[in-house]
Amino acid sequence: MVGGMGQEQFGTENGGSGVNDQTDWEDFPRRIKGEVFERLSKVIDPELGRSITDLGMITDIVVVPRRDTTEADYDVTVRVELTIKGCPLSQTITNQINGAVSSYPRARLHSRIDVASMSKEKLNNLVADLKAARRSNPFTKPGIKTRIFAIASGKGGVGKSSVTVNLAATLAALGYDTAAIDADIYGFSLPNLFGVDTQPTNLNGMLMPVTAWGVKLISIGMFAGSDRAILWRGPRLQRSLEQFLSDVWWGDPDVLLLDLAPGTGDMALSVAQALPNSELVVVTTPQPSASDVAVRSGLVALQVPTRVRGVVENMSWYDHQDEHLEIFGSGGGQRVSDQLTEALGYQVPLLAQLPLQPEVRTVGESGRPAVLKPDGSLDDSDLARRFVDLARTLMSATS
């Protein structure tokens, strides 16, 4: 444990509740401290993914009996030290603490939260502890549970980023701990599509990903600004990916999506080298000019240790009144699937066909994934159902 006060200091030796049938009721405030501390150990910091007690954020719990017990039996003050002043998730953490205290079953408690920020020394120790646990790229360690999908396309304009955003939002809405990296350094778009205009929190050189619509995000656009052109050569691109993987505290997500740049350039090679357990999802539209190029993006798997999980055909049709219009033709996704299956020597399925819908653009450009309602729950549209099927197929498939 880093900093903070241990469980034994709150009167719960050996992990017990500290309360039994022989409880000395005059000593009950001390017993309450122990049980409240245990309850707070289940409150998880949403950025770091660890218990606030393990992180040393709980510095004291003070329990005082009330004279007037009309509304509560005890006043409980929880003293909390957050990582930095103005922590963006301060309200989320304090709400969870209040919930843990107010739902205490053995007495009626009125909670008060005193919030401060960690000292520089304590924060340095915490960051050192977190870095020691991680050391380097966390997605290559043995036994990693995270499924990693690199979303690729042969050319731009096929809706690859829209597919990435809506797939990530769907996975998060289904309950998966979801992370996404905007690996399209020159053409970054995830911040706008997720409605993000803030920079990641910097904890002494370790970055906390920005969370939007339940998805943990990182993008060069969060640092460069939307009006700046990125002019980097290959080695700098590779270094940016390494930093996104190693210098960002991801926790242990269930799934990581990478929105690749179109084509088969430096970043595609860097992803394959840095994440050899990643799986490629190829996005195309139906017309041959897109599908023929998409095949080449999948053939990267012949030269690097990456498996192609499947193909997504985007903009497959447009429903207008009673007409089912195939604006970009038909069959492109299946052609890519067939050609990659033959070339790679294993089955590369057509995972999904997605309709062309104006809402993907209009809602997406407002900063909300089109598969979600304004409250963040999954929409009941045909598009959302297709993304749900795609998400479940990807997560259920054997890697």
How would you label these PLM feature ranges?
Residues 18-24, 74-84, 149-151, 279-280:
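Short, hydrophobic beta-strand segments
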Residues 171-234, 238-246:
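Phosphate-binding loop that captures ATP/GTP phosphates
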Residues 55, 91, 104, 108-109, ...:
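C-terminal lobe/tail of nucleotide-utilizing enzymes
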Residues 245-249, 268-289:
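Inter-motif core of Ras-like GTPase G domains
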Residues 2-59, 63:
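N-proximal, solvent-exposed amphipathic alpha-helical segments enriched in charged/polar residues
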Residues 40, 58, 87, 101, ...:
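Residue-level signature of catalytic and energy-coupling elements of molecular machines
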Residues 54-60, 64-72, 76, 83, ...:
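Extreme N-terminal, non-catalytic leader segments
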Residues 147-185, 298:
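Walker A/P-loop phosphate-binding motif and the immediately C-terminal alpha-helix
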